[in-house]
């Protein structure tokens, strides 16, 4: 039996890089934790939507903001601000998100990380394969 497992985002198990950001993954038994790092100007609908093929994010995260500020902008017009220290749950209702201010937005994702990471890689690989087949 293992007494302890130590991991660190300095050496993540996986990384999903995209324009103006990245999503790092650390895998533990029965749990996947994600770390989102988004730079100034990052916006889901601009930087991730083209990879995903959907206009809005539909992942349902539970997490904590480590630094910076971002908004969650629901398709129905409701807007919420996430700031350092906030614990957040965002429903799977279609939503956009973007960084506010010049500081990088960094958050940890305790629920939804595995789905987001897998969803990103599937969409990225599909787009690359589609481009190869078209050429």
Question: What kind of region is each of these model predictions?
Answer:
Residues 91-117:
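Ligand-binding loop in jelly-roll beta-barrel domains
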Residues 34, 78-80, 106:
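Short beta-strand segments
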Residues 35-56:
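Conserved short histidine dyad/triad with adjacent acidic residue
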Residues 75-92:
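Short acidic-glycine-tyrosine-enriched beta hairpin
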Residues 40-42, 111-126:
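Glyoxalase I/VOC metalloenzyme domain signal
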